[in-house]
Amino acid sequence: MKVIFLKDVKGKAKKGDVKNVPDGYARNYLLKNNLAEEATSGNMKALEAKKQKADQLEQKEKEDAINLKDKLAEIAVELEAKSGDNGRLFGSITSKQISEALQKQFGHKIDKRKIELDEPIRALGYTTVPVKLHPEVSGSIKVHVAEK
């Protein structure tokens, strides 16, 4: 029997896969537990429509990430911190602070986990910080740390 998997089934298939499985296994386990549905022509068309919609959504997310990357390249996030001699900060600037400042100053909401700061910023001046906006799109933000 040909079935469309609705959920991941360990060792068998992932969600959205179409596979041929034994009739008894399909009727007694997969269909009863709503793990799969029979692969009728109507269900196959619905699956194709879902895949197309998911592809369009993915494409839109990628385009949005590219647009955001271009906007971020033009701006510099301004942060203030107390510092001592030689421009060293008391404390440090973290990705969370950069994310909050970006939201407050420019209205761009970027999750702090997407800001790829190897180690916190501990000096005054300009720093370029890489940002992962999408699995296929990376950009960078200029961060200016000024003395308070």
Curated annotation (Swiss-Prot):
Q: Which GO terms describe its biological process?
A: translation
Molecular function as annotated in GO: rRNA binding; structural constituent of ribosome
InterPro entries hit by this protein: Ribosomal_bL9, Ribosomal_bL9/RNase_H1_N, Ribosomal_bL9_bac/chp, Ribosomal_bL9_C, Ribosomal_bL9_C_sf, Ribosomal_bL9_N, Ribosomal_bL9_N_sf
This protein's GO CC annotations: ribonucleoprotein complex; ribosome
Q: What does this protein do?
A: Binds to the 23S rRNA.
- Matches recorded under PANTHER family: 50S RIBOSOMAL PROTEIN L9
Output this protein's name: Large ribosomal subunit protein bL9
Species of origin? Oceanobacillus iheyensis (strain DSM 14371 / CIP 107618 / JCM 11309 / KCTC 3954 / HTE831)
The opening ranks of the lineage are: Bacteria, Bacillati, Bacillota, Bacilli, Bacillales
